[in-house]
A protein has these predicted regions:
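Alpha-helical structural segments
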Residues: 28, 32-43, 57, 75-95, ...
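Short, hydrophobic secondary-structure boundary micro-motifs
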Residues: 123-129, 135-136, 190-191, 213
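Residues that mark the N-terminal boundary/hinge immediately upstream of a DNA-recognition element
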Residues: 50-51, 72
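Helical hydrophobic small-molecule/effector-binding pocket
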Residues: 94, 103-128
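C-terminal peripheral helix-coil segments that are non-catalytic and often amphipathic
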Residues: 1-17, 148-160, 168, 172, ...
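Amphipathic alpha-helical packing segments from all-alpha helical-bundle domains
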Residues: 89, 125, 133-172
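Short hydrophobic/aromatic patch on the recognition helix
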Residues: 59-69
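Basic, helix-initiating cap at the start of DNA-binding domains
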Residues: 1-44, 51-57
Length: 229
């Protein structure tokens, strides 16, 4: 694998509609409640946010929130987090379609995902003030939900360069790298810095993958730098 394969220029992702805007008002009640929950977490965290707070920001009644999420706060915040992850991954996937090599796809994906995590008010509030709330997201079940969503959205892009099984592996490794450095930060490693993201992505994802593929039969090994035919 050559040292450099270019990069993908990513535009800022469209922010989620904010409460009080026409775009927000045009959404369904469920969509407003999910977005309102994320807004509340970004301001007050999970512990201090009540269902009444979410209802007020969403512009609906408390009864509506409970009708949509009868199991209360745990169900609401779990659903809000999953919806937010799905929204961000879909937008990220659209922008990564311009990647011409696996290197560009992985490096740009890791860098962008880390940057988005750092810019999320809700996630940063939890990491700074309620780490005990953020910690369960590292559990096997919660992490698998995130990984499954990432594979569903991003693996088709990686399949341009490698076989489907390897594509899933690449996406999962990338997601794990971002999750690890987001929830267990290393003061010396900032994935929001593109050069650092490139170094980490190549060290922990691309180089091990290249070694694995090199150990396979030559006739079955696709190039990491060219689309598969």
């Amino acid at each position: 694998m050559s040292p450099s394969h270019g990069s993908v220029t990513l535009d800022p992702l469209d922010p989620a509609p904010r409460s009080g805007t026409p775009e927000f008002a045009a959404l369904s009640a469920r969509e407003r409640v999910l977005l309102a929950a994320m807004e509340c977490v970004g301001q007050w965290g999970v512990t201090k946010t009540t269902m009444d707070d979410v209802a007020r920001v969403a512009g609906c009644g408390r009864a509506t929130v409970y009708r949509l999420f009868p199991d209360g706060k745990p169900e609401l915040f779990r659903s809000a987090a999953q919806a937010n992850i799905g929204r961000v991954l879909l937008q990220l996937g659209e922008q990564l379609r311009s990647a011409e090599t696996l290197d560009a796809l992985v490096v740009s994906g890791v860098h962008a995902a880390a940057t988005l995590s750092a810019e999320s008010p809700a996630l940063q509030y939890l990491l700074d003030h309620e780490p005990h709330v953020a910690a369960p997201h590292l559990s096997f079940h919660r992490l698998e939900v995130l990984l499954a969503t990432a594979r569903a959205v991003l693996s088709p892009l990686a399949r341009q360069f490698v076989d489907p099984v390897t594509a899933d592996r690449v996406v999962e490794l990338g997601a794990r790298v971002v999750v690890t450095y987001t929830f267990l930060p290393d003061p010396g490693i900032d994935l929001c810095d593109r050069a650092t993201a490139q170094r980490i992505a190549r060290r922990h994802i691309l180089e091990p993958l290249a070694r694995s593929l090199d150990s396979s039969r030559p006739s079955t090994v696709p190039s990491l730098d060219q689309p598969t035919t």
